[in-house]
Amino acid sequence: MTARGPDVDAELVERVRRGDMRAFEMLVVKYQRRIQRLVARMVRDVDLVEDIAQETFIRAYRALPQFRGESAFYTWLYRIAVNTAKKALMELRRDPLIVESALAVDEDEETS
């Protein structure tokens, strides 16, 4: 297996469970761009993409004790990212002030 394979992910996950924050940083570095690209297919706002990607990793870290390893780590992380993006989009639709604020920023940028 290569240094990028699931065996390495399983080892990193186990190290994180034992308190090794550096191992979690390695998982973030490994998957951050992939998660950002995934979220960008669902969300057009670049800042929101970054926020959702960051929230994905926060949620993954908090849920790591429940990760059973029945699927690849990235598969699990992918699902967290999709659910986090869906939740963010639903919140945007529910709160018209957020949408208005985002539109105002877009209008300001267009007139500058």
Go through each PLM region and give its residues.
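Short, charged helix-capping/linker segments at alpha-helix termini
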Residues: 2-3, 17-26, 36-55
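Sigma70-family region 2
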Residues: 17-18, 57-72, 91-92
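A short, glycine- and basic residue-enriched loop/turn
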Residues: 21, 32, 46, 50, ...
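Hydrophobic side chains within well-formed alpha-helices
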Residues: 9-12, 23-24, 52, 73, ...
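Internal acidic/polar
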Residues: 2-9, 95-112
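Structural recognition of an alpha-helix C-terminal capping motif at a helix-to-coil junction
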Residues: 51-58, 71-83
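Arg/Lys-rich amphipathic alpha helix in sigma70-family domain 2
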Residues: 65-69, 79-100
